[in-house]
């Protein structure tokens, strides 16, 4: 019975969360369309399971008398400080009940998953492979369906309940129907781009460290998955995701070149050659189809796009977010930004920068705590870069932090919980 409560149930629930993230969006839309009375509970299924896991982990730590060990851990200290600061802001700058609850879930769920996974897997490392396989299975679903959407009808998700009141089955680039942005099983093209960029970086890191040790069949499978992930990034038409891929894969390439004792001159020449090829290919592509570059890359095609593009919306959002954050250094309250703000005054305030998003809600102190926590995890991953999971999570995490400059990337549950779960597995790994 003790093993069931302290070991088996947390493992089952974490596996369910890790796999269920891949199908969370279509599941909640489908249930909401057919059984709207149960929609709210279904949306919170992973948070409910996570709360139970946290409770069981606390019980296990208490029974094992490990509090001194974990309270002296810098990652745990920063995570607790980040959570407690939310409580302080909630008292100092109160918001409505539903907005506060929604804001707490959005802000803390990925940190809670990372902490729960970190502590649980440290105590029971035999479940690390289980959890990693669940994340891998979820990635196959997300990337596989994204590839299928390249040939499926663009409204294939409508029968599940997708639409203007839930999640759009697809989007376009600045209202130009020529360029359709796919969602896969996520909440939109930008989350898909961020997710696929992380998966692609992990695959490249795995290949860079394990290529000589794996079979030819696995190499083909790895190459196929990398190609599909790259297609998913491309078809999302997310420029920030393309930048994240460049950063993540670039980190893997540069670090491996240095570790292989290649001369810096060779590395620099190689980087220059890749950049030069990119410029040449881009120039040829622009000459062949200037509308593609104008629409997808520059968002500046007057023949199709509206006068108000996503770029102009983003600039307006950044200006408003920075002004508000400077005016209210303690923040405007948990749940005052993003989708949670709809539950307060009924008006959603969107800030297209994750760091300004956090500063707007919980102030500059809250932002510093999040940056310190994320940096601490990245440092741990860097120190374990000889293992592919840690190396890939580090490079992918840097890519996501770059996306955060343009989008509130960690607001999306699937993307945020994917990376924080991966990072937790990686900083406890022993050579997967």
Per-segment meaning from a language model:
Residues 54-55, 245-250, 392-403, 409-432:
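Transmembrane alpha-helices of multi-pass inner-membrane enzymes
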Residues 83-91, 112, 116, 129-258, ...:
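Alpha-helical transmembrane segments of multi-pass inner-membrane proteins
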């Amino acid at each position: 019975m003790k093993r069931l409560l302290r070991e088996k149930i947390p493992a089952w629930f974490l596996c369910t969360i890790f796999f269920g993230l891949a199908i969370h969006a279509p599941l909640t839309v489908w249930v909401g369309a057919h059984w709207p009375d149960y929609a709210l509970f279904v949306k919170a299924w992973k948070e409910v399971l996570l709360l139970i896991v946290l409770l069981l982990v606390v019980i296990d730590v208490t029974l094992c008398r490990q509090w001194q060990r974990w309270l002296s851990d810098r990652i745990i200290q920063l995570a607790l400080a980040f959570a407690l600061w939310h409580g302080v802001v909630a008292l100092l700058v109160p918001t409505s009940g539903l907005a506060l609850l929604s804001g707490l879930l959005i802000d803390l769920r990925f940190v809670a998953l990372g902490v729960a996974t970190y502590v649980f897997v440290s105590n029971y490392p035999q479940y690390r492979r289980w959890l990693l396989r669940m994340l891998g299975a979820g990635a196959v679903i997300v990337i596989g369906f994204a590839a299928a959407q390249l040939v499926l009808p663009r409204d294939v998700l409508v029968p599940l309940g997708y639409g203007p009141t839930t999640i759009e089955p697809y989007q376009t680039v600045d209202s130009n129907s020529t360029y359709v942005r796919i969602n896969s099983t996520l909440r939109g093209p930008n989350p898909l781009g961020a997710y696929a960029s992380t998966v692609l970086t992990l695959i490249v890191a795995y290949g860079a460290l394990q290529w000589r040790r794996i079979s030819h069949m696995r190499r083909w499978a790895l190459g196929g998955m990398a190609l599909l992930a790259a297609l998913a990034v491309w078809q999302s038409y997310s420029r920030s995701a393309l930048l994240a891929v460049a950063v993540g894969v670039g980190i893997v390439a540069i670090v491996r070149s240095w570790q292989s004792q290649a001369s810096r001159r060779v590395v620099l020449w190689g980087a220059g050659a890749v950049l030069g090829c990119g410029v040449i290919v881009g120039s040829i592509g622009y000459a062949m189809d200037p509308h593609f570059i104008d629409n997808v890359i520059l968002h500046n095609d007057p023949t199709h796009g509206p006068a108000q593009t996503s770029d102009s919306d983003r600039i307006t959002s950044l200006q408003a977010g920075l002004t508000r954050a400077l005016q209210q250094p303690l923040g405007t309250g948990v749940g005052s930004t993003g989708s949670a703000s709809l539950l307060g005054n009924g008006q959603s305030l969107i800030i297209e920068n994750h760091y300004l998003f956090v500063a707007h809600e919980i102030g500059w102190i809250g932002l510093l705590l999040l940056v310190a926590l994320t940096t601490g995890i990245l440092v741990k991953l860097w120190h374990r870069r000889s293992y592919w999971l840690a190396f890939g999570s580090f490079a992918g995490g840097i890519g996501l932090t770059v996306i955060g400059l343009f989008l509130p990337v960690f607001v999306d549950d699937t993307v945020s919980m994917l990376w924080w779960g991966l990072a937790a597995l990686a900083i406890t790994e022993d050579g997967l």
